[in-house]
């Protein structure tokens, strides 16, 4: 069980990590910043590590190759340093608030396919729905929290639900 968290929220996931360990999971808590400091996965370390998201994906691929199947939980949202990849959605398919980029974690769950990422004129790396694979290699979840309090609330609710499923 891998938890990827921004450095400033690492201490806030300790209770969640301990709970998962009590449930029998082997848990690794890794910060985004530590991945990016690693000589093997820092941006520019190789052709596959060209931005934060690609470096985190390469780290996940390495963990998967060396550890086998696991689950990845990202902690953080747009207010944090948590990585996110976006799809370039044609405006004729959807026009939600005129945004043509839709966030997705499919990039991090599909560790086998070669994603055709292109940098658009605004400097955003994106992928069209036609060049991406939607076949997950690992399950990926995301806890949309940006503060210690939000993480603690979620963790308390999760523990209560998992201890007493009918009452959560």
PLM features: residue spans?
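Cysteine-dependent hydrolase recognition
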Residues: 1-168
């Amino acid at each position: 069980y891998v938890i990827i968290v921004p450095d400033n929220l690492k201490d806030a996931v300790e209770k969640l990590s301990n709970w998962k360990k009590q449930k029998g999971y082997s848990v690794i808590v890794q910060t985004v910043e530590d991945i990016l400091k690693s000589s093997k996965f820092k941006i520019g370390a190789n052709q596959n590590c060209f931005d934060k998201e690609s470096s985190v994906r390469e780290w996940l691929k390495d963990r998967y190759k060396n550890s086998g199947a696991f689950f990845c939980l990202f902690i953080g949202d747009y207010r944090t340093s948590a990585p996110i990849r976006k799809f370039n959605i044609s405006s004729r398919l959807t026009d939600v608030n005129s945004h043509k980029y839709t966030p997705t974690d499919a990039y991090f769950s599909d560790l086998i396919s070669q994603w055709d990422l292109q940098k658009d004129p605004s400097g955003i790396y994106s992928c069209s729905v036609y060049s991406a694979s939607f076949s997950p290699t690992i399950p990926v979840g995301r806890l949309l929290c940006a503060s210690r309090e939000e993480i603690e609330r979620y963790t308390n609710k999760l523990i209560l639900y998992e201890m007493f499923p009918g009452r959560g």
